Amino acid sequence: MPDSGIPTRQRRWIAIFALIALGGLIGASGIIASTEINRATSSDAFCTSCHTMATVAANPQFQKSRHRTNTVGVLAGCSDCHIPTDNWFIETYTHLVSGIRDVIAEKTGNFSNPAVWNARRIELAKISRDIMRRNHGVTCRKCHEVSAIRAPVGAHAPLAQGQMTCVDCHSVHAQPAAASKQ
């Protein structure tokens, strides 16, 4: 290699700086790309583009639920309840894991058939509730603030103290009563 006239030590620092700059550029590009992917895959249109979720979204109990029809006009979308957005890494991880899980479920089960979906509805509702319990109601609290609950006493006192989650009492997806008690 011909000598460029730049001392070896200086070349080494230039190479290190170039690698750090390249790593930063790749990292920033990855964050920007994943943020855009998160945004694009968070719409109700995207979520219901597969047969399974179209069946769930069309369910009359869900369409009549408070998250779809309420007095203040707020319409909760799929990602409002299913994707925690308080942390970019957790949001991206949740999109990735739930996306893979949903694609596998779509390809291995015939949930677009309402009879098949109804036969497994309680089981699927329990899985959804368990996920929401594990995330300690973080998605519920995007819209419902514990501090806004008038006098968090009685039933809401354990919630305010972090001893229970919203879905321990409140059903989601207008779930059947059997799923609410599990």
PLM segments and residue spans:
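Short sequence/structural segments immediately N-terminal
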Residues: P2-Q182
